[in-house]
Amino acid sequence: LKYTKREFEKLLKDKLMSECNVTLDAASADQIYRCLAMITRQIMSDRQKQYQSKVLGEGKKQVYYLCMEFLMGRSLRTSLFNLGLNEVAESVLADADVKIDTIYEQEPDAGLGNGGLGRLAACYLDGMATDGIPGTGYSILYEYGIFKQKIVDGWQQETADNWLPGGQVWIKSHPDQAQEIRFDGQAIETWEGGFHHVKYENYNSVIAVPNDMYVAGYGSNGVSKLRLWQAKAPSFDMSSFNAGNYNTAISQSASAELISKILYPNDNHTEGKILRLRQQYFFSAASIADILQNHLNQYGTLDNLADKIAIQLNDTHPTVAIPEMMRILLDECSYEWDAAFDICRKVFAYTNHTVMSEALEKWNADIFRNTLPRIWQIVCEMDRRCRADLAKAFPGDQGKIDYMAIIGDNQVRTANICAYTCHAINGVSKLHSEIIKDSVFHDYFLYKPQAFKNVTNGIAYRRWLLCSNPGLTHLLEETIGDGFKTDASELKKLEKFVDDKTVQAAAAKVKRENKANFANYLQKATGQVIDPDSIFDCQVKRMHEYKRQHLNALNIAAEYLYLKNNPNAEFTPKTYIFGAKAAPGYYMAKQMIRMICKLGKLIDEDPAVRGKLRIVYLEDYCVSLSERLMPASEVSEQISLAGTEASGTGNMKFMLNGAITLGTLDGANVEIADAAGHENEIIFGMLTPEVNALKGMGYHPNAFISGDNTAMAVLDFLEKGWNGENFSEVTSNLRNSDPYMVMADFKDYRRAQHDLQELYRDKQKWNHMSLKNISNAGIFSADRSIMDYARDIWGATPVK
């Protein structure tokens, strides 16, 4: 795809005139952004049609990726880059005295995701397009996304993330392809002349309207489609409205459209639980209907479905897609149960993202039965047949059968639907995949060991390196050529230069410039001043007890007390950078945010530690902010309790940008340390077997507190608090239950932080470690992950 500068300039000027009635010279930054986005979207749409035509012409297998969220970030920069149009666009705008970065800043982050699950899904759309694997993602078009985070006096406050006005330009609605989704009511089964019939009564309909976004591959003709379903009422109730029942008419419409309002509504109450289940069925059912219609249009039969499609369920949220496909095959296509189930088994695969059995999703059976009456009937029959199959495999072991069953304790266990049905069940790191086999799904591993796979997560590395870190990209081009842009494994060529003094100096210079750039951005955006010569120590991820941001905070408090007592001690200045949202109903996570923010304020206002210690809390952390931070980062905090993080992908982005991992051997940290060398990371904490052994003996945090003067002093300090505020909820939790063993790892974490300071002073050693990480980050490319899925799970081959 090539445009000359003149051709692209004409495209932009024509679009500005037709859409906004302005010339390029007179256009606002927002108008230029919208028109550039429209041009880019149209180019991707045209390319996707050509690509899809080739896919169908060759009869290739297609992949459908169902996920509750896709954390897309901004689209313009990456789309132009992947299409090879970024330089010509930049040049055209420069002639009009417009900086392209100003245009990029007009775009809001798409409010379609929250954390690692959604970012992984977004990276995989990029990977599929680049690798030429025909892929479509399915999710919901959330009107308000997750939420915008404001920190007010230390407390997180949530406001609506009204992203659609700026983001709508990337989305094309297709109301002609809408699906009707039915909830509630009764499903009445009858048998007539040996044939099974199901009749629905008193149901409520919601219309699912598809809206499409596109993700272009880099250096390939591939384009992935992301189809997002928007909930609409079937029609406005004019009779109620005309009769004066305005509230009735409006509430019916509002109730339907509530489904696509926000991601992960608070489920601390029954209404929230019902809404979440409705969301899951809404998007799963609409997606299955869409997939089957497309297949029938192409092939005229569903008998070859398993040869032509693969459906990946990313976590358990879309599990109801399985009984929904069974419903269509049984009720609408007259398949026998065994034939229908065989199709589902061959089509569906499941990615698990959980390491704790108790965290697996379950639905109250009464809510499930009332909300999805026909799906409930099918799930009951699945449970009956599942129990019968398990009884043959484990005769007499009723406890095992009850544990593995789909329904139990008045709950529908979605993970067991997946484990029983899917032909492949994969974890997302080597450690996680072993944990799945050893504990989470141990019994299912005994039942069907061939189904269990590992696909270590990967990232869209071009976004996080080529687009976000041009300084490092340029250094790599000069040192190892540009092969790494299409093949991440080429980064390995850098390894022979890790002790080259010229390369070390150049890499250090790039890092210092990136830190200065981030410091300048932060000052302009928030007024906060940070020292670019201090260590940038970063922990950015969802706020959660298992991710142990409070362990980090405890160490900062210990360093603060140490500096107060030892004002002349040698101490390398440190800036601790946090970015995290807490789930709205997660009180302890909000307390952790308050503690970190208040500790930061105390440190800021104390002249005794000025210039030595700093905490920065990045409000409303998101993908675009991450793209600024990663190139500037030096320390990557990955400090979850061993055996609790499935994989992580932030750790990979930090590694790629030359940060040193300070972490436990958990999730993908294990593979990062294996790839770069354990001596090039700073590892601390218990190993997973040690954690399990300590739990088995009975963990008592006080055993680790009482003999540690620093631990006692820090907990007392935070418990008493300052300026009339204390953090006794957090400290009481740590003293009494400490579910994620913060206190057991605290002493070794402090040792690791001390080692970090020593290493940082040895610039040659630090630069060696940093370059080792960059040169071994290639294995964590989404391109590699997608080819693993295609080969080992989907049976899909590239379309070039």
Protein language model features and the residues they cover:
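A conserved ligand/cofactor-binding region detector
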Residues: L1-K800
